[in-house]
């Protein structure tokens, strides 16, 4: 498969968002789906004529290629301030919200940086026991009180995943946070990456307690209002905590603004929205996916070709390449694994 302009592909496996049966990493190739992997490189090749001069294709040629990708709903590519591609061959369009699936984890990462910058959380090394002891159940796994913000943000809590075969039991439990904090330790905290939406949900609850604002309020205040992004309410757990790490929704244009924020060191329209040093920390490799081998920062995958990527089931993508001055947003059919073009 050609690497194209973007030089990376996304292989999406089953995710919890639809049937609620499983929740697998958005970068994990499912053994039955590998040949149907969604190739972002094709989209890169489609956009390349506007970015470089490698191919002599007309805009109609590019639109034809995009239209031929049956699962693709929308794609926006921006270089600098120039719109390279803005197409929505199907789906709700560019200006109506779409479920961004596990791209939500990357949004939680940005909210974490803001909470630290504002002093609601003292540092990345602060622990659950220090910040939000009230969320820890009496029968929690010993040691969870010492889990740090960084452990949660990098999916290195060491707790057994709530994803995969455990997902159904988790979301059908009467307390999602307690369920996740009662999982046995299967690795040392701060050790290997264990993809688990439950870990990000714990972080979301910690953010809510630490800031005194729920995730919806934080998302709207930190990102929605400054960037002009519509962020509707999404799923809440039985205790009222917004789902941390899944089910958020944005328009494709809103997703593109998040991408430009990452590309431009946390700046948007001349304002510093997220501290630049947090963007730097977020785009450093803190661990590595055991499935794709990609490095993982503070909620963002890091491609070998230089892209910073938020990924969600079915082909939901927010990506930035600072060196190439590129910002990308892609939405796809959220009910099916992504396919190649």
Question: Language-model features: where?
Answer:
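Boundary at the C-terminal end of the N-terminal hydrophobic targeting segment
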Residues: 54-56
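Active-site Gly/Thr loop motif
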Residues: 230-231, 276-328, 337
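Active-site-proximal alpha-helical segments within enzyme catalytic domains
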Residues: 199-206, 246-267, 316-333
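N-terminal secretory signal peptides
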Residues: 1-33, 37, 41-48
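Active-site helix/loop module of the DD-peptidase/beta-lactamase fold
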Residues: 118-157, 182, 210-250
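Active-site SXXK
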Residues: 81, 99-124, 152, 203-207, ...
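Catalytic-site signature segments of enzymes, centered on catalytic residues
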Residues: 88, 95, 163-246
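A short, well-structured edge-of-sheet supersecondary motif
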Residues: 63-93, 318-319, 325-329
């Amino acid at each position: 498969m050609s690497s194209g302009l973007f030089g990376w592909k996304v292989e999406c496996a089953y995710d919890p968002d639809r049937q609620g049966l499983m929740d697998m990493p958005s970068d994990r190739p499912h053994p039955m789906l590998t040949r149907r992997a969604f190739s972002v490189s094709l989209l890169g090749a489609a956009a390349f004529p506007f970015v470089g001069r490698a191919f002599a294709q007309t805009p109609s040629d590019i639109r034809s290629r995009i239209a031929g990708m049956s699962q693709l709903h929308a794609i926006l590519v921006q270089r600098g301030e120039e719109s390279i591609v803005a197409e929505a061959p199907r789906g709700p369009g560019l200006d109506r919200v779409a479920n961004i699936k596990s791209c939500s984890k990357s949004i939680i990462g940005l909210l974490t940086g803001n909470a630290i910058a504002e002093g609601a959380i003292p540092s990345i090394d602060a622990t659950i026991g220090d910040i939000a002891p009230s969320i820890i159940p009496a029968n929690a796994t010993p040691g969870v009180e010492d889990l740090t913000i960084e452990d949660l943000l990098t999916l290195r809590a060491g707790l057994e995943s709530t994803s995969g075969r455990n997902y159904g039991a988790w979301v059908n439990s009467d307390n999602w946070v307690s369920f996740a904090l009662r999982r046995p330790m299967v690795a040392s905290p701060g050790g290997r990456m264990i993809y688990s939406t439950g870990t990000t949900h714990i972080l979301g609850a910690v953010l809510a307690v630490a800031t005194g604002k729920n995730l919806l309020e934080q998302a709207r205040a930190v990102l929605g209002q400054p960037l002009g992004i519509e962020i509707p309410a999404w799923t809440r757990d039985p205790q009222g905590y917004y789902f941390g790490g899944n089910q958020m929704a944005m328009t494709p244009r809103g997703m593109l603004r998040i991408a430009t924020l990452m590309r431009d060191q946390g700046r948007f329209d001349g304002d510093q929205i997220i501290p630049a040093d947090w963007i730097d920390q977020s785009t450093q490799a803190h661990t590595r996916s055991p499935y794709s081998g990609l490095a993982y920062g503070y909620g963002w995958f890091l491609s070998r070709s230089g892209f910073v990527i938020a990924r969600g089931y079915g082909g939901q993508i927010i990506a930035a390449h600072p060196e190439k001055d590129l910002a990308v947003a892609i939405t796809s059919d959220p009910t099916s694994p992504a396919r190649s073009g």
